[in-house]
Amino acid sequence: MKPSVPTGPRRAPWRSRDVWAISLSAFFADLGYQAVLAGFPLFLVLTLHRPVWEYGLASSLSYGGGALFSYAGGRIGDRLGHRSLALAGNAVIPLLSLCALVANPVWAIGLLTGGWWARNLRSPSRRVMLVEAVPADEDRSAAFGFLHALDVGGGALAGVYVLAALAVHLAFRWIFLATVVPLVLSTVSLSRAHVGGRRVADAPDASSGSPGEAPPPGARALLAAAALYGFTYYSVGFPVLTVAQGSGRLLAGIGAFLVLQATSALTGYLLGGRLGSGPAGQFARLGLLGYLGAAVGAGVVAFGYGEHLGLAVLLIGVAVIGFALGIIETLEPAAMSVLRSGSRTGRGMGALSAARSVGTFVGNLAMGLLYGVSVSLAYGYAAGVAGLAGIIVLVAVPSLRRWHRDR
């Protein structure tokens, strides 16, 4: 007798209770802090009347210090347990919700930075928890795409919230303070995941290598590209300011935030499981669709702003940037989970987050300074460096393919 064949749609096997808990935590976290990130440049520049370079400095401090917290978070999580560290860091993020309660820009930037550093501390551990929840390498890109979709989907809803709040002239202090609620729900949701506990180090395997063995050929290329992309990974506040200033409408800036977040979320959700399971294929798509796509998007914004082509062209450029971001946020951690597996996953994720943060420290500072000279020059710089990141990743594909074949 032949076994019966199940019919009808089936739930993806990797979409377990732990994956849902981690992904919903990401949704609520972005729903909270992305509302602050969307409104903070408007609060600092338009309400407190501070120059744009101060916003660039604030972003640089957040990401620069965040690099240290990311790197330390990966290592500490490997020693003490990723679940405990992720919960502790997540619980401190609401500091940034308090930044509009003060009129002093130094205190406002300090509160924003403190909450962001807590986010950086927990981010590598949250990624490791997802890796442990999805043991099959071939399912990782789909899982990280799902995480990114809910993550950025929360950010898109945050944009809707800020847009509606500004439309009814709600003060920034109340807009930001209300974000404490979803941030607390984020920590509650993360606590329902039961992976990421403290464990003894795994025995070295072919993918993680022995302590003295050189890392896989793609690992250094991935970290270098992540850092270079970080040099162009300006805070989302810059597109918000660009569209608001280019169109002369404050609400259009928040609309740009919504376009970027929604495009990025849909990309992760729809394409996450279709981007390949092997590291060589993932690297090729990361370089072409991710980094080079980001270069194209920044170029469109630079050209559209410089030639005064109107709101539609600016939003097209922002949408391309969002698409590229969805590819990058899905494939970077998925590739690293293969290159650095087992007990080295935390260090690999920490190094990846740190590389991005170091680059972003420079990127936001450069964008803030160049933005004051020429908006088109700032985005032209971003396009050039993102293109270089894409080339570095694509050059590593042949050697990575050989490494994966010989494993």
Where do the protein language model's features map onto the residues?
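Symmetry-related core transmembrane helices of the 12-TM Major Facilitator Superfamily/SLC fold
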Residues: 173-191, 379-396
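A late C-terminal transmembrane helix in Major Facilitator Superfamily
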Residues: 344-373
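Helix-loop boundary and gating motifs at the non-cytosolic
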Residues: 12-63, 220-256
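Structural signature of the two symmetry-related core transmembrane helices
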Residues: 84-98, 180, 282-300
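Cytoplasmic helix-loop-helix junction between adjacent transmembrane helices
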Residues: 111-151
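Conserved MFS/SLC helix-loop-helix module at the cytosolic interface between two early adjacent transmembrane helices
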Residues: 67-104
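Helix-to-loop junctions at the C-terminal end of transmembrane segments
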Residues: 69-81, 266-281, 371
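C-terminal transmembrane helical hairpin of 12-TM major facilitator-type secondary transporters
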Residues: 282-332
